[in-house]
């Protein structure tokens, strides 16, 4: 249990001058969250920008707890002297359990498709939030605490350890990151692809493991149709790491492999990661700096699958398609027998679906304190206006939108929206907030404040109030105003008749007829459906 984990860590830390235990936050139920620092100079950890720092996180999904045991084993071996050399030129931060409340909701019956351990934690937090969907919106206290760790220590490499769901294959340790073809942080992604992956694959193979790519089947009933090469959005650890220039590796050990095998594979991956940082970490630091200093003119917001696949030889397993008497539908029954899929298609998510011109800045009115709090949690810099400022800015108005019909991760998301953009002259009053994109986290600011981005704060419903009207009209009040309006603008009569001819709902609804004119009166709410964030191009 969690207390036993902490008791073990305290004994380990007490036995070594190389380790230090630190509380960095509280779970939703009030459990303390801890990290372990491992360094030959604990008092200077993260103070030397030339010394690489590895952040390893386990238990973000507490049923997938391989990383905790692997990390505890590695810390033990470092503390007892066998692996002290791993800290020669690099330091380590280890979070044994991020979702502490989920860890304590342990049961024999939490994950039916995972082989071990016997007791498994729960996927979500006590607030029923999936922390690996929370990076961008940062609703959970656990995520807010984690962002504090990232901002404070500024790690150079981040490893997030999970266990898979889904298909069966021969690989026992699969992992992935944003590939260079779709990366915001191109230099960091190139280091992961050219330096990290070959070294980790070689170490795992030498230890008897079968490392593989992080992929998902295109067709659950026909694996031969190929696999999808996923590009994560910023709600996920690896997508978030890419947009904030933190090279991030998402480890997904194969759920159908024995627990011992998965833990030992994770140990090898973590050990090799430290070795690699000690030997080649300076190159990674330079890559990160180059990504943070880059100032591109455009930025991809989302990606879609490339219809022209690559091909790989994939170490899968054979299966049968069985007709279920219970569901009435076919399902896959894996045999566990090795099968090599020659030239299996891989459809990479490397085609830009949506992109945006990166503006000079975003301007936020002061009433959106929850949005400003999120920006601060992410480490995004902003300034507060102290005197009136006349400026020409871009205003976005929603012309079509749709909210989700059920909640996702505690929120009703804006599933789709289209915008009209126009330039306006505005005098901003003191208190308005300027978020410049000319900063290291400028592209993270775009991902959060550009409303078309899939994990923008707009998409997550932080600006839901803009979709509501709070002032209305009565027929006796609006009738004379419409007569007056038509006298002043007689061309509106023809426009109204054209609208009636084209719109059956308008023809058959007297209230909507009034509303057509109401939108043209000065009484109409000028903020309705207007995105409150103004954009400086």
Report each predicted region and the residues it spans:
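Structured catalytic-domain cores with a bias toward divalent-metal coordination
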Residues: 1-537
């Amino acid at each position: 249990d969690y207390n036993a984990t902490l008791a073990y860590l305290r004994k380990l830390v007490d036995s070594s001058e190389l380790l230090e235990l630190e509380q960095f936050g509280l779970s939703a139920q009030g459990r303390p969250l801890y990290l372990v620092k491992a360094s030959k100079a604990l008092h200077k950890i993260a103070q030397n920008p030339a010394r690489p720092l590895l952040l390893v996180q386990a238990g973000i999904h507490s049923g997938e707890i391989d990383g905790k045991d692997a990390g505890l084993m590695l810390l033990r071996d470092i503390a007892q002297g066998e692996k002290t050399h791993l800290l020669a030129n690099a330091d380590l931060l280890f979070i044994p359990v991020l979702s502490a409340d989920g860890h304590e909701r342990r049961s024999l019956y939490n994950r039916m498709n995972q082989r071990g351990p016997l007791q498994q934690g729960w996927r979500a937090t006590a607030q029923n939030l999936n922390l690996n969907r929370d990076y961008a919106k940062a609703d959970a206290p656990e995520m807010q605490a984690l962002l504090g760790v990232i901002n404070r220590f500024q790690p150079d490499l981040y490893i997030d350890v999970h266990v898979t769901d889904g298909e069966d294959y021969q690989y026992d340790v699969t992992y992935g990151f944003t590939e260079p073809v779709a990366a915001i942080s191109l230099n960091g992604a190139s280091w992961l692809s050219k330096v990290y992956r070959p070294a980790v694959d070689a170490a795992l193979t030498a230890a008897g493991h079968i490392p593989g790519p992080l992929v998902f089947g295109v067709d659950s009933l026909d694996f031969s149709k190929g696999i999808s090469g996923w590009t994560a959005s910023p709600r996920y650890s690896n997508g978030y790491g890419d947009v904030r220039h933190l090279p991030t590796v998402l480890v997904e050990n194969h759920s159908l492999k024995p627990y011992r095998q998965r833990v030992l594979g994770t140990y090898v991956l973590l050990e090799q990661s430290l070795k690699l940082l000690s030997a080649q970490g300076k190159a990674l630091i330079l890559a990160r700096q180059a990504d943070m200093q880059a100032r591109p003119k455009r930025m991809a917001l989302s990606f879609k699958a490339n219809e022209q696949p690559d091909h790989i030889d994939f170490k899968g397993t054979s299966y049968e398609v069985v007709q279920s008497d219970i569901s009435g539908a076919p399902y896959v029954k894996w045999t566990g027998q090795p099968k090599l899929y020659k030239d299996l298609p891989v459809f990479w998510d490397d085609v830009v679906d949506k992109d945006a011109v990166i503006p000079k800045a975003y301007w936020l009115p002061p009433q959106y304190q929850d949005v400003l709090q999120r920006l601060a949690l992410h480490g995004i810099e902003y300034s507060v206006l102290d005197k009136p400022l006349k400026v020409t800015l871009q205003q976005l108005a929603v012309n079509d939108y749709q909210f989700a019909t059920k909640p996702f991760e505690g929120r009703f998301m804006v599933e789709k929206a289209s915008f009209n953009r126009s330039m306006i002259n505005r005098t901003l009053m003191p208190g308005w907030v300027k978020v410049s994109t000319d900063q290291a986290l400028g592209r993270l600011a775009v991902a959060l404040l550009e409303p078309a981005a899939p994990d923008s704060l707009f998409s997550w419903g932080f600006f839901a109030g803009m979709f509501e009207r709070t002032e209305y009209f009565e027929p006796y009040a609006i009738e004379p105003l419409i007569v007056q309006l038509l006298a002043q603008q007689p061309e509106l009569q023809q426009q109204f008749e054209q609208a009636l001819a084209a719109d059956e709902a308008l023809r058959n609804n007297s209230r909507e007829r009034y509303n057509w004119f109401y939108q043209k009166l000065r009484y109409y709410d000028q903020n309705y459906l207007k995105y409150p964030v103004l954009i400086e191009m």
